[in-house]
């Protein structure tokens, strides 16, 4: 029979910091009792983004380590999760649970030059380089700002021959074990991920247009299910209701144009799918026109809360202004919104989307939306169409074809202006 235990949550009081979980990047500590830890906290307790910043320092006989909870080198922990540590007392059968925070410890490597400057005699100064002599003068007679800059530069220097040899040996072992081809492939994938932060997940080797930008990656199944009630008004729209939307200009030109053809769909399942997609697309277009986003701007009576939360999480960034945290639309997030709008519109329009209408709805420059469409692998064609005033004008159409189109950057040099 399995043993049972009761647990008691202690949390972390205002005086204590809770449990600290550390992970050393270069190995495992053999004797943890010989490590001295020091925790530093940010003094600015008024700013909600900096008051929780901490730095943890560890001293050992051989190396010193440092870690923090606010830089890019920290552990990739979800900000939406809380972490705990439990200590089980086998005699009483009780487990005490405490709040925990994780730190990734990095070694601080110095070249040894710092100690030599204090011990070497002045007679040995001619053998030093010009940079070493300047550093010695700064340490003796420099201003506080110069000394801080020098200290920062030395902390960032990794000039140890032992480390270089170890890194070279490790690189040789990795190349021998995995092979050069595999490493080049990994580097290409990493570079592709870094350059596509604002694009929807894309399969450039897709065999069908619908698999290039999969629908579930654009609108999650949870959001899609929640849109059933929200899109009911579009699904059951009448001629009078559509005319009222046109007069009140509640939606953009692209959505209104698709709503005209929505009433001609006889299949109930296809009609419901198009209505949900148009409702979500209309919400993204309205979101792209905002600078500062509040929940009340998105959470309208017909908007599901899960859709509101997803839009705030995926398409806004947190900024600190006027003493409080705000959600805003940055340049990168707006580009991401435009890319998702184009991808969803492709699914709505059988993978041929009128980029000119979307550009006007989002108040973008034509060159900007064409640039994003080209990065997404779309073919751009010009098609003559009639506007509401029966004037013939050229519209840019984006087509998704297999394989996706790859545009090479122009390598032409800029022409010099003649005087």
From Swiss-Prot:
Pfam families this protein is in?
RNA_pol_I_A49
- BP terms from Gene Ontology: RNA polymerase I preinitiation complex assembly; transcription elongation by RNA polymerase I
Q: MF terms per GO, please?
A: DNA binding
Coarsely, its chief localization is nucleus
Q: Which keywords accompany this UniProt record? A: DNA-directed RNA polymerase, Nucleus, Transcription
Question: According to its record, what are the GO cellular component terms?
Answer: RNA polymerase I complex
| Subcellular locations according to the entry | Nucleus, Nucleolus
**Summary of the function given for this chain in its UniProt record:** DNA-dependent RNA polymerase catalyzes the transcription of DNA into RNA using the four ribonucleoside triphosphates as substrates. Component of RNA polymerase I which synthesizes ribosomal RNA precursors. Appears to be involved in the formation of the initiation complex at the promoter by mediating the interaction between Pol I and UBTF/UBF.
Q: Which family does the UniProt entry place this protein in?
A: Belongs to the eukaryotic RPA49/POLR1E RNA polymerase subunit family.
Assembly: Component of the RNA polymerase I (Pol I) complex consisting of at least 13 subunits.
Name by which UniProt lists this protein: DNA-directed RNA polymerase I subunit RPA49
Q: What organism does the UniProt record list as the source?
A: Xenopus laevis (African clawed frog)
Q: Which gene name does the record give? A: polr1e
């Amino acid at each position: 029979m399995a043993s049972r235990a009761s647990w008691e949550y202690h949390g972390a009081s205002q005086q204590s910091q809770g449990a600290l979980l550390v992970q050393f990047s270069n190995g495992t500590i053999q004797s943890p009792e010989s490590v001295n830890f020091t925790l530093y906290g940010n003094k600015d307790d008024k700013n909600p983004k900096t008051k929780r910043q901490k730095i943890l320092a560890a001293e050992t006989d051989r190396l010193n380590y440092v870690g923090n909870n606010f830089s890019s080198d920290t552990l990739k922990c979800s900000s939406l999760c809380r972490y705990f540590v439990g200590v089980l007392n086998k005699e009483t059968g009780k487990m005490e649970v405490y709040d925990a925070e994780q730190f990734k410890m990095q070694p601080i490597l110095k070249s040894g030059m710092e100690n030599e400057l204090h011990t070497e005699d002045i007679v040995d100064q001619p053998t030093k380089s010009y940079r070493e002599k300047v550093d010695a003068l700064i340490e003796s007679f420099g201003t506080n700002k110069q000394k801080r800059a020098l200290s920062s530069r030395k902390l960032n220097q990794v000039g140890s021959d032992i480390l270089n040899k170890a890194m070279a040996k490790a690189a040789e072992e990795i190349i021998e074990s995995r092979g050069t081809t595999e490493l080049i492939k990994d580097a290409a994938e990493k570079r592709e991920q870094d350059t596509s932060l604002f694009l929807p997940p894309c399969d450039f080797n897709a065999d069908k247009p619908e698999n290039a930008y999969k629908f579930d990656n654009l609108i999650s199944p949870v959001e899609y299910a929640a849109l059933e009630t929200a899109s009911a008004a579009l699904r059951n729209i009448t001629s009078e209701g559509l005319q009222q939307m046109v007069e009140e200009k509640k939606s953009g030109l692209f959505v209104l144009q698709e709503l005209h053809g929505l009433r001609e769909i006889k299949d109930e399942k296809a009609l419901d799918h198009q209505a949900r997609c148009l409702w979500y697309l209309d919400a993204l277009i309205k979101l792209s026109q905002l600078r500062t986003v509040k929940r009340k701007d998105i959470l309208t009576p017909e908007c599901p809360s899960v859709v509101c939360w997803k839009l705030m999480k995926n398409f806004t960034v947190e900024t600190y202004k006027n003493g409080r945290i705000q959600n805003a639309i940055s340049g990168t997030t707006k580009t991401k919104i435009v890319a998702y709008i184009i991808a969803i519109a492709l699914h709505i329009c059988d993978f041929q989307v009128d980029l000119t209408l979307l550009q006007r709805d989002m108040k973008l420059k034509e060159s900007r939306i064409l640039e994003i469409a080209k990065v997404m692998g779309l073919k751009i064609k010009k098609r003559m169409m009639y506007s509401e005033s029966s004037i013939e004008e050229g519209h840019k159409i984006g087509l998704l074809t297999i394989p996706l189109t790859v545009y090479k950057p122009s390598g032409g040099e800029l022409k010099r202006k003649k005087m």
